A protein has these predicted regions:
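Long, contiguous hydrophobic alpha-helical segments, chiefly transmembrane helices and signal peptides
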Residues: 72-74, 120, 152, 178, ...
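Cap/insert and terminal regions of metallo-dependent hydrolase folds
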Residues: 171, 179-268
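Binuclear metal-dependent hydrolase catalytic cores
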Residues: 1-172, 189, 250-274
Length: 275
């Protein structure tokens, strides 16, 4: 499997010369299973705009494009109206969520609301693509890859779910928008156990977290603790705070490497292969 990061920022997109090395687009990842010639998108932050253009090329052409959502906060869906394949009448697109305990509104309604005429010139039903809005339980197999979901500590309606993706090449665990309340969540440690790659929220410093407790995010130290205790091979910290510019993130990354050497911070365009 291969992961490519198209958006690594949390809360809202950022721009400016001081955000070029790590990137300013909000969360969007592409998972590629080369053996099955299949791709899956995780979340639709503003990074999905660039990805959408790439998916129009013959290299990436897919009969069905599946977008699997961890949750539906604005920074994880705000790029969807600018996703070029959604305007192709021949394109089939699956809008997918997992988690048997998830309590939330109708999925289609969430996307239709953000594209109402008061907010956007094109409404969901006028985009053109053939959409399927699908909900699954905690475990599902997609094109030979087993995907497991876990409810994370995220107090907002609909919650947020971590994802564990497994195939013959290895294991990728994605835990964005997770808050470890009263200590690191033991369920998440077990969920991430022995993963080849852990992608974990690290929006705040320890000092910042005191101010933003209850906002649904983690510190870098918490991400490192999960990685160590779960015995993961590689840790990528993502969901960077919009106030953290390149120099700030680079400094944080160096500190994190001292605690967990095989740790890096997500950057737009970064590709990681799991074998």
């Amino acid at each position: 499997m291969k992961v490519k990061f198209y958006g690594v920022r949390g809360s809202l997109p950022t721009c400016g010369p001081e955000y070029q090395r790590y990137g300013g687009n909000t969360t969007c990842l592409l998972i590629t299973r080369e053996k099955a010639n299949r791709v899956a998108i995780i979340d639709a932050g503003t990074g999905i705009r660039k990805l959408g253009k790439e998916l129009l090329t013959d290299q990436f052409k897919q009969e069905i494009i599946n977008i699997l959502f961890t949750h539906f906060h604005a920074d994880h869906i705000q790029g969807f109206p600018f996703f070029a394949p959604a305007y192709n009448k021949q394109q089939k697109i699956g809008i997918l969520v997992m988690g048997k305990e998830r309590k939330m509104k109708n999925i289609k309604e969430i996307f239709a609301t953000q594209m109402q005429s008061e907010y956007f010139p094109v409404q969901l039903d006028s985009m053109g693509a053939q959409f399927d809005f699908l909900s699954f339980g905690d475990t599902q197999t997609f094109y030979g890859a087993r995907v497991t979901a876990i409810a994370q500590q995220h107090i907002f309606p609909g919650g947020s779910y971590g994802l564990r993706i497994e195939d013959e090449s290895g294991v990728i665990v994605i835990c964005t928008d997770i808050e470890h309340i009263n200590g690191v969540d033991e369920n998440i440690i077990k969920f991430a156990e022995n993963a080849d790659l852990l992608i974990h929220d690290g929006q705040y410093t320890e000092t910042e977290y005191l101010k933003y407790k209850g906002w649904g995010h983690s510190t870098c130290n918490q991400a490192i603790e999960v990685a160590k205790r779960a015995n993961v091979k590689k840790l990528i910290i993502t969901h960077h705070d919009p106030d953290h510019d390149d120099d700030f993130l680079e400094n944080m990354e160096e500190k994190c490497k001292k605690e967990f050497p095989n740790c890096t911070f997500a950057k737009e365009g970064m590709e990681v292969v799991v074998r």
